[in-house]
């Protein structure tokens, strides 16, 4: 009997040694390792600045806040996303405005963005869903035409690229996640990339209670520094222990991406032959990191999505629903009446399959054969 989880972080001796070094140094809160991790990350994606946080959720909140988003403002977001996308807008007192997605990519429908812009719109928040880049060029044109900000929810998108430029390197603010289900992990954690030095500096203060000076600056100063608090902030600081793990993870990122791509290709080749299943489509402008692998059950499928998930679990195979429709959750009941047909169909009929480097060929073959077997019953 197999016991196959939906994902498994790839952690080993290197991460263990790096974390041990931090413990031995005595500096376990935010310090030099966070700064090192930020530098490595910024260089990798091609951004001028990277600012580490406690999660992608806090990264999104910080990015919106320092961008001046607040009460009376609207931010255009896809409903087909993890709930943190819209929650971060509400945290600022602003209003999320939900739009539908492209049914082929599960990413925000560019045409719907154009139709949704009002005089209250301040920003567009495209989500690179499951690691597949959104179509950024037309979104940028809409933003420039209407003088809007773009803040990318890149939670899943490390290593993905749009038009051969990595996500995070397109000049917009972009927010990444290091949750254990992502390509690399720091346990919990996030990162914001930006090119504007003023925005980057404000983000660093925002994550540190709005304080005028960092712990490193005080530690390295030759004289006493009395800090000030020029603006409201939060404690969104990543620790050096987490950053050490992240540094170790960045060293193996290329391997992790290659392994996922190979496994996704195997799923494509086998599941793409089943007439009841639609597999992910990757546009020519995108390089997909396959943070997750999703399939959609078509109307012709002999079982529904939930039944398939239950039968796979009986065989020891964990799955997850594809993506939530935020507007259908109880805390967003004020949006319950909006019509987003692609979002509704995808949230009801998609599921995520196990995908991680430690997944063996035998286990992946078992997953594929189990789906085929269930469809024949």
What does each model-found stretch correspond to?
Residues 1-27, 32, 228-230, 354:
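N-terminal "arm"/small-domain region of PLP-dependent enzymes with the aminotransferase-like
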Residues 11, 29, 81, 104-105, ...:
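Glycine-/small-residue-rich active-site loops that bind phosphorylated ligands and cofactors
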Residues 27-74, 88-92, 98-100, 165:
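Phosphate-binding glycine-rich loop
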Residues 35-39, 47-50, 111, 123-127, ...:
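PLP-dependent aminotransferase class I/II
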Residues 51, 76, 97, 150-151, ...:
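Structural detector of well-ordered beta-strand residues that form the stable sheet scaffold
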Residues 65-154, 161:
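PLP-dependent aminotransferase-like
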Residues 152-186, 225-230, 278:
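Conserved active-site segment immediately N-terminal to the catalytic lysine
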Residues 169-213:
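Active-site PLP attachment segment
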